[in-house]
Amino acid sequence: MTIPRRTVLSGGLALSLFASRQVVAAEKVSIGQATPALSFLPLWAARAYQTFGAVGLELNWAAIPGGDPAALAALDAGDIDLAAVGSDTALAAISKGQPFVMVYSLLSKMSLQVVVSGPLLKRTGVTPHDPLVKRIDALKGAIVGVSAVGGTQDRVARWIAAQGGLDPKTGIQVAMVGPPPAIQAALENARIDAFVLSPPESGVAAAGGYGTLLIDPDADFRQLHGLPNLVLVARHDPDAAAAKRIGGAIAAMQQGAAKVIANPNDAADRIQAAFFTRIGQPIMRAAVHSMLDGLTGGGRFSAANIAVLTRFSAESGTPVPDTKDYWTNRFIAS
């Protein structure tokens, strides 16, 4: 039987194209994010600027209901390659023996802020210009809305209460409400007295006329400067393929962070258009600018910022792992 030369050529071409597609097919990396907060800024920027594709990866991103603990549970189950969570929650999990390691600092700054309702201001007579101790004391008995009980917002709220002499367990009431839009609605409708969220949420509440920024931990507590607040967490023992995906994902986020630093307004506009359409441009731009000093160092950990983290964790009641291998820079190429 004679096969026409054209058929052979077309078949060979098809095989060649198929092989080519196999070669260039992007590998998937899965990242779970505990809350849809802007403070995970390098990740938002990497998505907005599509830098995952630039490093040969296809991102499978998931917002995981339940906050930090749920994101870490997904990591433990092998459902995701990386969890984007609060560093204190990661430390607590590692201290309990879970096989995790912090691999990248998404934001080396305490970005969470305490915003309170108008009724609370009226009831207590406190103002944002009062001494810090008086502002903290105004939170006594307040209902503070968070995305997840036991998560970073919860821990920070209780730590702040303790700094003013309140009992961190009973001095405030912490209520799980949900993601930021639900928390905003709860404050606006007087179902909670306060929330602990990152920008742009303080700007949103102020623009809506129902919330006032009362405590800004980064400004009010100098001991928190440099804190690696939000981190990427991986399993402690990734195989070679997973390690390559992790390194590539970090490179993509470094590129995203570099874009933010180079042109904050452009980054804010892109992120807003893609993911935060409910936020006005001036508020979004101000929020991005407020986080720029948390993007230094290329996401690397240092002895200095780990010391800040361990001190904060000890003060907030978070156990610190006995071992010293709960963080690493080995996946960061440059």
Task: Enumerate the predicted regions with their spans.
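Secondary-structure end/capping motifs
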Residues: 239-318
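Sec/Tat-exported extracytoplasmic proteins
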Residues: 50, 79, 84, 94, ...
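N-terminal export signals
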Residues: 7-24
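C-terminal segment of N-terminal export signals and the immediately downstream linker at the start
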Residues: 1, 19-32
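Pocket-lining segment of extracytoplasmic ligand-binding domains
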Residues: 181-272
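Conserved C-terminal helix/tail region of periplasmic/extracytoplasmic solute-binding proteins
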Residues: 310-334
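Short, glycine-/small- and polar/acidic-enriched structural segments
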Residues: 26-167, 175-176, 193-199
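Short, solvent-exposed loop/beta-turn-alpha elements that line the ligand-binding surface or hinge
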Residues: 54, 121-127, 219-225, 292-302
